[in-house]
Regions:
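Conserved N-terminal/central alpha/beta ligand/cofactor-binding core
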Residues: 1-31, 36
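A glycine-rich dinucleotide-binding beta-alpha-beta segment and adjacent secondary-structure elements
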Residues: 34, 203-281
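A conserved short coil-to-beta-strand element within the FAD-binding core of flavoproteins
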Residues: 34-47
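Core beta-strand elements of the Rossmann-like FAD/NAD(P) dinucleotide-binding domain
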Residues: 55-65, 133-136
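Glycine-rich loop(s) and the adjacent beta-strand/alpha-helix scaffold that form part
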Residues: 65-111
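Glycine-rich phosphate/pyrophosphate-binding beta-alpha loops
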Residues: 75-76, 104, 141, 145-148, ...
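An active-site-proximal "capping" alpha-helix that borders the catalytic cofactor pocket
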Residues: 84-91, 290-303
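An anion/pyrophosphate-binding glycine-rich loop and adjacent beta-alpha core
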Residues: 93-99, 103-221
Length: 303
């Protein structure tokens, strides 16, 4: 189903994708070899020899074309490794620096304590890093911030730098509070903010700023400071949750070393790299799957 324009998700679970791929492999007559470690790859006059190790012993596979579809480093518990990068380097292909992407951001100290207190709370937010902006859900967690907007911006964020978050992207909070002060001066500032934000979040923000009481008793300068905190919240992540939870790996085999039509290595005929092992990273919503399908298709046609 389509969540947002261009974003496609499984109706049930990712098992549907696995089942589809297995069915397609069986229909094409592909042989699946599980629990097999590739120990060596050699170039020959007619293609490649691939040496493997299994519980039953060692084996050698010969082929004219070899497609590396080993993925990146994300989610190591399912077997992610540097295998594809090592193969690329073995055959002289450049590999760009890699790091976790589409990944939750972590924080330390007082900010982390506040995130833990708000854990599970989600809001629509606009997250900005430089000129890159995403507006989607933001989720407070016991490690920091997550949700689609945070995952998206993590692919662009550089460690040590700050992000700007707008917790009410459709509302000028300073103008709202000043208007409420004029219209309903006896209203409590928490009540005014809780009309727009989850009350727990509004209370936490006001506590952080040491702001409380009736709007009539609060100077405009303090209302402006509150509005700034909500519309232009500056946060400085300490890092990410790493490959353990990253949906993709940023970086990989340099695209300039591959044919854009076939994904074949320009300097190694018969050797192809596809999917996440290549330095191509898409947004949330099936784009990385689509890259895997598309690059795999053209490589398969050419191999």
């Amino acid at each position: 189903h389509e969540k947002k324009l261009g974003q496609l998700f499984c109706d049930d679970s990712a098992q549907q994708i696995i089942d589809m791929l297995v069915d397609e492999c069986e229909g094409a007559g592909a042989e699946l070899r599980l629990n097999t470690a590739v120990t060596d790859i050699r170039k020959t006059a007619n293609g490649f020899t691939v040496h493997t190790d299994t519980q039953s012993g060692t084996h050698t596979i010969t082929c004219q074309s070899l497609v590396i579809a080993s993925g990146g480093l994300s989610i190591p518990k399912i077997g992610a490794s540097r295998f594809g990068y090592d193969v690329a380097k073995q055959f002289g292909l450049p590999v760009t620096a890699v790091k976790p992407a589409l990944v939750p951001l972590t924080f330390q100290h007082e900010f982390l304590h506040r995130c833990r207190a708000l854990s599970g709370l989600s809001v629509d937010a606009e997250v900005r890093y430089g000129k890159t902006v995403f507006r989607e859900g933001l989720l407070f967690t016991h490690r920091g911030l997550s949700g689609p907007s945070i995952l998206q911006i993590s692919s662009y964020w550089d460690e040590g730098q700050a992000l700007e978050i707008d917790l009410l992207p459709d509302i000028d909070v300073t103008a709202l509070l000043k208007a409420r002060k004029s219209e309903t001066p006896r209203q409590d500032v928490l009540t005014a903010l809780a009309d727009c934000l989850p009350r727990r979040l509004a209370a936490d923000i006001l506590d952080e700023l040491s702001v409380s009481g009736r709007l009539a008793d609060l100077p405009d300068k303090l209302l402006a400071r509150t509005g700034q905190r909500i519309n232009r919240w500056q946060v400085s992540p300490s890092g990410t949750e790493g490959y353990r939870t990253a949906e993709v790996t940023l970086g990989g085999v340099d695209v300039n070393a591959l044919s854009s039509r076939t994904m074949e290595a320009k300097t190694q005929p018969g050797l192809f790299f596809i999917g996440e092992v290549v330095d191509v990273t898409g947004h949330l919503g099936g784009y990385n799957f689509q890259w895997a399908w598309s690059s795999g298709f053209v490589a398969g046609e050419a191999a």
